[in-house]
């Protein structure tokens, strides 16, 4: 049974601007593990990675039903990749659910869609 669906799109320019203005922007959005990956990337890929993770976490928060705020933070959500490179989400505040995520980006935008499926108990 579908618990929630979330979609987010963000401009790469906007993320680059925020990262340039706010010194700790990436640290606020990315978990420690995600930051390790981020620091290994070229400058161009860093912005795509950060924008994609931002969009995925926003989409997850919408599917979760709370948005980012008091009940759910960017740090509660981690995007990982399986052995084939397919992204998946780990969230400490969610159990008994399967989470499906798709992340994409173009030259100008990053977008993500998340579906949370409640598993029968």
Curated annotation (Swiss-Prot):
- Places the protein is found: Cytoplasm
E.C. no: 2.7.8.7
> Can the keyword NAD be found in this entry's annotation?
no
What's the catalysed reaction? apo-[ACP] + CoA = holo-[ACP] + adenosine 3',5'-bisphosphate + H(+)
Q: Which cofactor does it need?
A: Mg(2+)
Q: Which GO terms describe its biological process?
A: fatty acid biosynthetic process; lysine biosynthetic process via aminoadipic acid
Annotated GO molecular function terms are: holo-[acyl-carrier-protein] synthase activity; magnesium ion binding
Class of enzymatic activity (EC top level): transferase
Pfam families reported in the protein's UniProt record: ACPS (PF01648)
Q: What is its main location?
A: cytoplasm
Keyword annotations of the record: Cytoplasm, Fatty acid biosynthesis, Fatty acid metabolism, Lipid biosynthesis, Lipid metabolism, Magnesium, Metal-binding, Transferase
Name the InterPro entries on file: 4-PPantetheinyl_Trfase_dom, 4-PPantetheinyl_Trfase_dom_sf, ACPS, P-Pant_transferase_sf, Ppantetheine-prot_Trfase_dom
Q: Where does Mg(2+) bind?
A: 8, 58
Q: Which Gene Ontology cellular component annotation is one that this UniProt entry carries? A: cytosol
The record's annotation in Gene3D superfamilies points to: 4'-phosphopantetheinyl transferase domain
- Fill in the subunit field for this protein: Homotrimer.
Physiological role: Transfers the 4'-phosphopantetheine moiety from coenzyme A to a Ser of fatty acid acyl-carrier-protein ACP. Also modifies the D-alanyl carrier protein but fails to recognize PCP and AcpK, an acyl carrier protein of secondary metabolism.
Would you identify the family this protein belongs to, as annotated?
Belongs to the P-Pant transferase superfamily. AcpS family.
Q: What is this protein called?
A: Holo-[acyl-carrier-protein] synthase
Q: Which species is the source of this protein?
A: Bacillus subtilis (strain 168)
Q: What is the lineage of its organism?
A: Bacteria, Bacillati, Bacillota, Bacilli, Bacillales
Q: Which gene encodes it?
A: acpS
